[in-house]
């Protein structure tokens, strides 16, 4: 596939075995200069371990140090650190599942940290309150 204006493709996250299969299948059809990036923060580890070069993260914007530490642990092959960081982030991933995605959760977390007003989302969206 010739994609001269495309530098990266964002793919939805999948569990580890399917992520590896999906990345391998896509790689067969893409120029080597096109990167693959995983979306869905809870799937970052599976996607990066499967060969994605990027993680399109919502939590990385609010929690950059933790997100960077996770990427570095994955990239270095530090299984114990990767597992520990995923365990620390598990409550956030569960909130994303519980509230139907990351937007309201991250907006509420940002408000709790004093980074925005508690009522900062545009209507009809509501904070978790």
Residue ranges of model-derived segments:
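Catalytic alpha/beta core domains of metabolic enzymes, predominantly
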Residues: 2-90, 96-98
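Conserved short secondary-structure transition element at the edge of the structured enzyme core
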Residues: 48-52, 90-126
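Active-site beta->alpha loop and helix N-cap motifs at the rims of alpha/beta catalytic domains
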Residues: 1, 126-128
